Amino acid sequence: MSSPRLQQQFIRLWQHFQGQTTDTTLQELTGVLNCSRRHIRSLLNAMQLEGWLIWQAEAGRGKRSQLSFVYTGLALQQQRAEDLLEQDRIEQLVQLVGDKEAVRQMLLSHLGRSFRQGKHILRILYYRPLRNLLPSSALRRSEMHIARQIFSGLTNINEENGELKPDLAHHWQMLAPLHWRFYLRPAIRFHHGRELTMDDITTSLSRLIPLPLFSHIEAVNSPMPFVIDIRLSSPDKWLPWLLASVHAMILPQEWQTLPNFAQHPIGTGPYAVVRNNSSQLKIRAFDDYFGYRALIDEVNIWVLPDEPEEMPVSVQFQSDDSHHEQLESRMEEGGYFLLFDKRSPLNQRPEALRWLRQVFNPVSLLSHANTSNQRDWSPAYSLLPRWHHHHPDTPQSIPDGLTDVTLTFYQEHPEYRILSEIMRTLLAQQGVTLHLQTISYEDWYQGNAESDIWFGSLNCYLPLEFSLFAMLYELPLVQHCLNDDLDTDAQQWRSHTLPMAEWCEKLIKSGQLHPLLHHWLQLQGQRSMRGVRMNMLGWFDFKSAWFAPPER
């Protein structure tokens, strides 16, 4: 097989002479390929052996020899591009082809199932890179899903019914309201080969104590081999579910010394990270996984180069021309909303907040959206689609002196950009300027910016009465926007006495949180793929999916 370097040199030669038979000299060719006379001879011989060209040399220095092209540079470039695509070397592919639109089409044509060297490979298209996969950090919806494929927790949650399942722990019990015990499986290994120890678990869980959700944990220790005790300062009936959350995934205790751990993490889950860069995330089935080995050997998540903002944010693993089979769609349990920052001077003007909520009513936003967005969005009147807690405010005129409003959202979210432009238009019609501020997800998560309003979103999972409160309570931004004492609410929630519907209604009626839209989650792919059940994050469990062989 020819080397990539030889292929590139032939393409340069072919492009220089535009594929035409020509009389030339070795000296001229050294200038074309920028190499010595001796090296140009070996290159021409190698290209001739590959059958790409014919070199009819004439004896004598300065004599002109004939160069004839048998193969075209375009054909070889296409072959090289196919090789790079098969090897998932997307960045090199962009450099070779040059045209990013052509690269997009090539990627789209190679989505879905691939069978290479006896391995089942799934290729998925996504609209942005997945750079941070570190549990207990600021993770977006898709990063949370991928982290669950890489890491394990003491417990796990059944995505279809919200019931608890064993994971690293095979059993657990509440010895007393403030004392829980978990019994661990033996012989569990991390992706880098080391066996899991009790110190890995105590270190992983102890690092969570500064977080609001875990602040009631007083101590984590191992009184005997394969046993973990957790002692609390206040009772928590949700603790086994809390330990199944992405925050509580177990890391190797030396994780901080491992290079670029957030982007190339090491866990004990069914898949291990092979590559993670701006154009691709590749994960491979972990043969030493303590559970059932994944049926798909490798999952490649490709990111299209410089994808336009109107690209749908659904998960896609088929090409655009394959009848657009939609495996599943569902209304998300959650949605987009606005948070009014209590640190802003605007928060001291309740009449201005009421007027803004009136302008930004869901139906008005939806009526200004394009057809595609209208199909994907639905008006929200609470945080969950099943509830109707928001009632339109009494129409009023624009408050005096309201001329400028700042809205903040995080990067790489196409729908925030679309919505913000609609909101800017609506305010401009009233003579008010909307200033848009885009920041990193980490800064958004922490609320690290001066802003009047923030875009927010929520993607709950089962059981909803657990995840709805947990996902809001864990978000530092929410603490900057809500006037309520969430710590008091957390005590009720942990004791299962917080009525979630009433709590949510109170939140919305306070005016600090304003529901906007619910989103239809979509999963598009091949019907030959079995075991696919879309979860409430819009993805599916990779380890349970498999490909049915073609019918004979």
UniProtKB/Swiss-Prot annotation:
Gene3D superfamilies: Periplasmic binding protein-like II. This is HTH-type transcriptional regulator SgrR. GO terms for molecular function: DNA binding; peptide transmembrane transporter activity. The keyword Cell membrane does not apply. The keyword Transcription applies. SUPFAM superfamilies: Periplasmic binding protein-like II (SSF53850). It holds the Pfam family SBP_bac_5. Activates the small RNA gene sgrS under glucose-phosphate stress conditions as well as yfdZ. Represses its own transcription under both stress and non-stress conditions. Might act as a sensor of the intracellular accumulation of phosphoglucose by binding these molecules in its C-terminal solute-binding domain. Keywords: Activator, DNA-binding, Repressor, Transcription, Transcription regulation. InterPro entries: SBP_5 (IPR039424), SBP_5_dom (IPR000914), SgrR_HTH_N (IPR025370), Tscrpt_reg_SgrR (IPR023767). GO terms for biological process: negative regulation of DNA-templated transcription; peptide transport; positive regulation of DNA-templated transcription. Transmembrane segments: none annotated.
